[in-house]
A protein has these predicted regions:
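Bacterial Sec-dependent N-terminal signal peptides
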Residues: 1-24
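CBM-like carbohydrate-recognition segments
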Residues: 9-10, 23-67, 75, 79-95, ...
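Surface loop/turn signatures of beta-propeller and other carbohydrate-active proteins
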Residues: 33, 37-41, 148-149, 207, ...
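Helix-capping and short linker residues that terminate individual alpha-solenoid repeat units
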Residues: 47, 81, 97-101, 126, ...
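Asp-box/WD-like beta-propeller blade repeats and closely related beta-sheet repeat scaffolds
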Residues: 129-164
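Extended ligand-binding clefts on enzyme/binding-domain cores
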Residues: 154-155, 165-277, 284-295, 307-341, ...
Length: 377
């Protein structure tokens, strides 16, 4: 009986220690250490920023996956400036002549994504307008043509929407904000018949293929984690740029708040989110990219006073601590990253040791999350 009591006591102590570790807000030093470790691993492995990727076919290094990475790197640079970070980003943009994969006439948001990093680099030292010339030409083309139906998959909202917001702020011209809303509103309310956003669940179908009657194996709608993470991050990045009196600011905030509530409800017990937000049986398990994007958005919302800190700080603390504990390897490799795709079954397997087909965007998402976690008071 005495042995059973001691064993039970030890179990309770260990359980308490685990819960406490999950919910203890990390220090800035700890957050920075994790970000530096993950980024240093990537920069060492991919030291040649000019190298093409050869997954299925040859792609240049300014595609969306790398653009997302540089968004994260430059966010890290803002909280921990290092010359090698800046040089790694600047030299990459310079190598590509500050251009996009398919030139200035592309309407493909995946091509536009690199423009976010180009603009961020330009804003750090606005002495060379060539850095933003090409991406501005492409955005002006969107603004000056009537089409609004380019963002037919929700990833596109993150890849391109913040660029229009950045130019609206930079030039003080409403036309960028207006076009941004028109394209967002079409994706939200019209594409696929009734739009890609389901206001009942406050989550998004990835593209028209997943609109009803499509269902997950458990009968629920298919809400892909990373896809919803892209929209959630985009809303944060847009709200960061637009003025308080922008016509549709309250609409964006309403969607951001609704998504936040929905995401809170489907967080896993261990702190991560599943690849499928409403069907944990469909390739369920820890997944780092969606989790990182949700942490980024919620941390940003807390930092800006849009989200209640008391309610949401425990959510993101649990998620961040879980990623650092379970996904970050001692050498900085980032595990549980789902490979490229459009739904839960793609990019599998997702494990501690699995290497995604592209390693860059997962690191970028993690750095975005860490950079906002660092700013928490």
């Amino acid at each position: 009986m005495k042995k059973i009591t001691v064993t039970l006591l030890l179990t309770l102590i260990c359980s308490f220690a685990y819960v406490q570790a999950q919910t203890t807000q990390p220090s800035q030093r700890e957050i920075l250490r994790a970000c530096i470790k993950v980024n240093d691993y990537f920069m060492e492995k991919y030291a040649d920023y000019t190298a093409t990727s050869n997954v299925g076919r040859v792609r240049p290094s300014n595609i969306w996956t790398r653009g997302v990475y540089y968004e994260g790197l430059l966010a890290l640079h803002t909280i921990f400036p290092r010359e090698d970070y800046y040089k790694y980003a600047y030299d990459w943009g310079s190598f590509h002549k500050w251009g996009m994969r398919n030139g200035n006439t592309t309407r493909n948001a995946d091509d536009h994504c690199c423009g976010q990093a180009y603009i961020d680099l330009y804003n750090m030292c606005p002495s060379n307008p060539e850095m933003i010339r090409n991406i501005k030409i492409s955005m002006d083309m969107l603004v000056n043509t009537p089409q609004v139906n380019d963002w037919t998959w929700i990833d596109a909202i993150q890849m391109a929407m913040p660029i229009l917001a950045k130019f609206g702020k930079m030039y003080g011209e409403q036309k960028y904000y207006d076009k941004m809303w028109d394209m967002y509103e079409y994706s939200r309310n019209t594409h696929g018949g009734k739009g890609l956003y389901n206001p009942e669940d406050a989550l998004w179908w990835r593209d028209a293929d997943f609109c009803p009657p499509y269902k997950e194996p458990n009968g629920e709608d298919c809400y892909w984690s990373r896809g919803n993470g892209w929209v959630y991050a985009a809303l944060a990045r847009v709200l960061q740029e637009i003025p308080a009196d922008e016509t549709h600011r309250n609409d964006y905030i309403a969607d951001f708040l609704a998504m936040t509530k929905a995401l809170k409800a489907c967080q896993r017990e261990d702190g991560f989110w599943n690849a499928s937000l409403h069907d944990p049986t469909n390739f369920g398990g820890k997944e780092t990219t969606g989790t990182s994007l949700f942490v980024y958005g919620m941390a940003w919302g807390i930092n800006k006073g849009i989200l209640n800190k008391e309610e949401y700080l425990p959510i993101i603390t649990k998620a961040w601590n879980a990623m650092v504990k379970d996904a970050v390897h001692p050498n900085g490799f980032l595990g549980y990253v789902q490979g490229t795709g459009k739904e839960p079954k793609d990019g599998q397997p997702v494990t501690y040791t699995s290497v995604a087909d592209f390693e860059d965007y997962g690191v970028g998402c993690f750095l975005l999350a860490g950079s906002e976690m660092y700013k928490l008071k």
